[in-house]
A protein has these predicted regions:
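Gly/Pro/Ser/Thr-rich low-complexity, intrinsically disordered segments predominantly at protein N-termini
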Residues: 1-189
Length: 189
């Protein structure tokens, strides 16, 4: 991602994103252009989103893929952030904004070489400030490997690393997937 050098107001950012051919993430007044994803990146995200959409039909929960922003307000830094998660689920009736969501319970990022460190550090640190978030998932494109961070009843995050023969149990939405379902039609080396 390449940063813009000018400070931008949130309202201007949101308005500009409606017509921009390139998506941008917003970090406290600066915007960063996003690169496109690979075919495998898109297919993995679509596989996960499809299972979620089907499972959650009629539940009041909503599944979003790639083009829906998540808004994070960080009071101690008096900054607003807007990211585009690869997949996101919100079940909160307060989440009524048309172009971004504030209360996701589940966020999925498919790892790319150009964004992996961002997904693992900056985004993860900021996503943890979302009081509604229960699970954060990182999915590899280069191997059948899924990492899931879960929030427990005591407010602590734990990490589980899953591989080819494991099951991904999504407590936040009551869905269990095989790792093979996530990587359906993906040819790995």
């Amino acid at each position: 991602m390449k940063p813009s050098t000018a400070f931008m107001a949130i309202a201007d950012y949101l308005e500009g994103e409606k017509s921009s051919p390139i998506r941008h993430e917003y970090l406290g007044g600066q915007i960063f252009a996003m690169s496109g994803g690979s075919e495998d990146h898109n297919r993995i995200a679509l596989n996960i989103a499809s299972w979620l959409k089907f499972h959650l039909r009629g539940s009041g929960c909503k599944t979003f893929i790639a083009d829906m922003k998540v808004n994070i307000s960080i009071a101690q830094r008096t900054a607003d952030l807007f990211y585009y998660p690869d997949v996101m689920v919100t079940c909160d009736p307060q989440d009524t904004e048309k172009f971004y969501k504030r209360y996701p319970c589940l966020i999925v990022e498919v790892l790319s070489p150009s964004t992996e460190s961002l997904d693992r550090r900056e985004k993860w640190l900021n996503y943890q400030t979302l009081p509604s978030l229960q699970e954060y998932i990182l999915v590899s494109q280069s191997a059948m490997k899924v990492e899931i961070y879960r929030l427990d009843a005591g407010g602590n995050w734990s990490l589980e690393i899953l591989e080819a023969d494991d099951l991904l149990v999504l407590n936040s939405v009551g869905l269990t997937l095989t790792i093979a379902e996530i990587y359906d039609e993906i040819l790995l080396p």
